[in-house]
């Protein structure tokens, strides 16, 4: 038995409650929305309750170690009591780092993240596929759209999934503007190539808007994403995008409701094709901005006939 398998076995008894929560809200016809939430101290009960008080029924994975069985048990139980699904375990490292030792370390980090997702009942563990850039762990590089990149990403995904052998969670690569997967079709090709049931899709439509053509056709891009990927989507990053007019093309992430993404379209497509996947707000500077984004999503959902609570 490998180290990851031993840890997962020890943690498994602590996490049975998570399975009963996973489909409860979806069966009631409601979507799950989440965002970063913090509370003083480290009480899982207080953190889970704070999510519900904010109107969220999905969460980013709390700070918990795979080898801390007691805290794992308390975290899973608290979030289950409050009907808050753990959407994702983020492991933001470069699986294609040019340095071999860093690559090895990063692969172990993501493998541990998938084991933690399995232990907590999170919908997925997510990372980007990586970058060949020597100066930025996520930055652009000519080879990031190459067959070599694709093959390396497939090999890494198989290695991570095969090490953990998850039964109730998935591993995903977040889509990117300048690295594979950079389109719905690229996601489908990667899912087919990895050929593992536990390899899924992490949807971030804003990350795919990398040209004026896609910016102007963003709603059709959103529809294409959900139409082609819907059943494979484990979690979704929800944000908005604007075009800062300069001498070169410059798209910028902004708070939902202040950009160009039609959330009426996005939420309707989400409800139709991927209702079980949590929608997670991200990349905002503080609580006030998250509260405003939350309100904008709920308002758009109301107009689209979609509810969250």
PLM region spans:
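Active-site acidic/histidine proton-transfer and metal-coordination neighborhood
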Residues: 14, 19, 45, 81, ...
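C-terminal segment of N-terminal export signals and the immediately downstream linker at the start
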Residues: 21-43, 50-54
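Hydrophobic faces of well-ordered beta-strands that scaffold small-molecule active sites
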Residues: 31-37, 59-61, 86-91, 125-127, ...
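Conserved, mostly hydrophobic/aromatic
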Residues: 51, 59, 79, 106, ...
């Amino acid at each position: 038995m490998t180290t990851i398998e031993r840890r997962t076995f020890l943690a498994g008894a602590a996490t049975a409650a998570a399975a009963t929560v996973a489909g409860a809200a979806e069966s009631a016809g409601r979507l799950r929305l989440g965002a970063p939430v913090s509370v003083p101290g480290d009480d899982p009960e207080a953190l889970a309750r704070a999510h519900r008080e904010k109107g969220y029924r999905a969460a980013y994975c709390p700070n918990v170690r795979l080898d801390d069985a007691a805290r794992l048990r308390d975290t899973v139980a608290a979030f289950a009591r409050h009907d808050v699904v753990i959407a994702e375990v983020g492991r933001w490292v470069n699986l294609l780092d040019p340095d071999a030792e860093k690559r090895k370390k990063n692969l172990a980090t993501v493998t541990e993240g998938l084991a933690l997702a399995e232990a907590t009942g999170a919908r997925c563990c997510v990372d980007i596929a990586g970058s060949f850039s020597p100066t930025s762990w996520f930055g652009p590089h000519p080879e990031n759209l190459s067959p070599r990149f694709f093959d390396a990403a497939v090999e890494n995904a198989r290695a991570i999934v095969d090490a953990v052998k998850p039964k109730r969670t998935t591993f995903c690569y977040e889509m990117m503007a300048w690295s594979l997967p950079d389109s719905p079709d690229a996601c489908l090709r990667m899912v087919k190539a990895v050929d593992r049931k536990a390899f899924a899709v992490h949807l971030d439509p804003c990350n795919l808007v990398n040209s004026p053509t896609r910016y102007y056709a963003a709603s059709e891009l959103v529809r294409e994403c959900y139409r082609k990927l819907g059943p494979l989507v484990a979690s979704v990053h929800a944000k908005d995008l604007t075009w800062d007019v300069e001498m070169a093309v410059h798209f910028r992430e902004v708070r939902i409701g202040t950009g160009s993404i039609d959330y009426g379209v996005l939420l309707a497509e989400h409800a139709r094709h991927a209702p079980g996947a949590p929608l997670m707000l991200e990349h905002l500077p503080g609580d006030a901005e998250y509260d405003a984004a939350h309100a904008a999503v709920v308002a758009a959902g109301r107009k689209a006939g979609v509810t969250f609570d």
